[in-house]
Amino acid sequence: MAKEGFLVGEALVGEEPEIAHIDLIIGRKEGPVGQAFANSLSQPRVGHTAILAVVRPNLPVKPATLIVPKVTIKDLEGAELIFGPAQSAVAKAVADAVDEGVIPRAMVEDLVVIVSVFIHPRGKDYQRVYRYNYAATKLAVKRAMEGFPGIDVVLEEKPKAAHEMIGFRINNLELPPYLGVELVFDDWRRVEGILRSLPRKDG
């Protein structure tokens, strides 16, 4: 890893409302990620307070990992999901990544990790929150360290774009299912009349 560079990872795991969406960056303490880590920890934001990932109370994981909630925490129930199962899951995933050699053990004191965690406001099941966030964090770390996805994968997959949280499948805009019409008239009023008669939406 370059001294001033950082790695990016993302993963979506599970089902609503406990679905886990993890975005993370991994970088050196003396680089931009280290600076962002220190700023986030020293300048808390209301509803998005960053917390250290701990394997258990009084035992922060290595490399030092910061958890930043994506959704504004508005009540004690939301706070408990972050400070409980999500915090433990992220820490366990990072520790396992080191144990399995995904993150080099020799670099744990040089690196920091910032993990942006999505907790659905309707999430209730602590076990699901833990399992999904563990799996998503571990996958995101692996993807970051491996540089996934490469640009070839992105370009190959972009026509098949779909996202389960959108609720619909995106059409291939390179081959739009639209009717192409060429109008050649001298009288603009005739063109306007034809355009007004066209349906405003599909189906």
Residues covered by each model-derived region:
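Accessory interaction regions appended to the cores of large information-processing enzymes
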Residues: 1-203
